[in-house]
Amino acid sequence: MAAMFSNTRSVASSSGHIVEFKAGRSRLEAGSGDTMRKVVAEPKKGLVFIKQSNDMLIHFCWKDRETGAVVDDLIIFPDDAEFKAVPGCPDGKVYMLKFKSGDMKLFWIQDSTPDVDKDLVKKVTDALNKPPTSRPAASRSAGSNANTDRQSAGGSLISSSDMNAPLGGIDQGQLMSLIQSLQGGNSDTLPISSVPRGEDASSEADCEPSTNAAEEGSSNPLSLNNPAIQQIFNNLGRSQKKEVAVSLATALSNETVAEVARNHAEELAPHLPTSDDPARELSETVRTPQFRQAADTLGHALQTGQLGPVVAQFGMDEATVGSANQGDIRGFAANLTKAEGGEDAAKTQNSDDDATREPEPKRNRPDNEDMDVD
């Protein structure tokens, strides 16, 4: 599924790491008592690093320093996981990355630097929950290559894919600055006002048409009179009015989903590798970080309107395909439920959009977070 949307979601890594430290992986084993757990360190030398890719997603990675291979590459969303020291560890060098789903990753510090673990929890927490939000500024071309660079960039700005996409999160102010920089600061064609961001879109640019505005609009691909540029701004306005995005991974991590998977294990089993206990396999699968990442990829594609053509190929009804094209995840769920014969359930869902069912509290089960370590 990820390859299906690879053209619009870049995964190229940015230069440098936000946080990094030498650490190996650890695992939990049964201890000497029912409530005891033993942390066993793996001998391989490793490196934990956090990076932000060009699509602004945060990656928590573990690399084998002996082979150079990145073994773990987890996409972490804000407040999706917590990094903390393992309580009860004698030397205080064992840390856990615990997800809200209950899964966890354990690491032991291998760095010999005395202050490596000083404020380590805060540094990692800030990197995961408060990632940088700025994008690299567009650099201006100089000399005789400037016109060629601007024409190349202008061609990409008015391509059909850019007109229909949300431009990777660029707002109107950033787009105006980008176009100005591509023009080399030529304010006659696209003047930029100093009005702070947050004003109406009409106040972002003070466009005083010149006497030859019509000629400029037809000859300059970066003129505001160009229909392609106008279409981009129209799409930006519509994208900024959309509702707050819904995390599909959070919705699917609900205990109700795991229960449904267990109850329909026989129907879902043909889609899984051979297993002696399909119900248990399904229950574990919907709680894994890999499942959450796949759900987030699907949710992103659905809420940005990229899933519409794919849904249409499955013979979905017009209302369901329309919701997918509009990026309306709630409408898509309601229409899909109705199309599958669950009209009453769809009505109930629409009336309870903001209600979230909390999982039942755990009873008489030890929590690994509060474990005693041998």
Curated annotation (Swiss-Prot):
Residues 13-131 form the Pru domain. One of its GO terms (molecular function) is endopeptidase activator activity. It is found in: Cytoplasm; Nucleus. Keywords: Cytoplasm, Nucleus, Proteasome. Residues 239-346 form the DEUBAD domain. Component of the 19S proteasome regulatory particle complex. The 26S proteasome consists of a 20S core particle (CP) and two 19S regulatory subunits (RP). Interacts with deubiquitinase ubh-4. This is Proteasomal ubiquitin receptor ADRM1 homolog. It comes from Caenorhabditis elegans. The gene is rpn-13.
